[in-house]
């Protein structure tokens, strides 16, 4: 079977650094699904307005030339323990496919280059190919009693985020709120913990410079 993208994702993240590790972690992060020309037909979205969430099947396109292995080291385990690639959500997979649940914010049927699907809470970088879109169905897709393997035992680390007023003024209120949440999740690689190092993250067309000391992340400047 050969498959082609049906859409591409438009996101504030030009690179994968800083992209949330899972969908739904930054619930106010806005993104847009832009269908490819041959699928820009409003009929293909008929009835979508009756759903709140969508499943996106997409490609880890930044990893096209990366090697894969039957075992991986999940960041949540500190890179010290191996698990099977199919028992993980590692982006380094044989077929490079990702699966994300996103909330529908707005559907623009008559937009330029539309129809467009605006969504919240995605974990995709800008330009990510999307291969399928399906509605999220509560009775079939929700399993609150399910075990989550090693993830259950390793809570996410949340940081306090300090953003100077001069930096905050360069973003809209929505962009700033999402940026704070993204940074609070600590976008650094888990093995890096140098309080003197300044990291850079492309977000909404600007290079956000920050450093982390203890549990406090401070934005240094925006270029």
Regions found by a protein language model. Give the residues of each.
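Mixed-charge, low-complexity intrinsically disordered regions
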Residues: 1-97, 109-223
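Conserved positions in beta-strands of structured domains
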Residues: 102-105
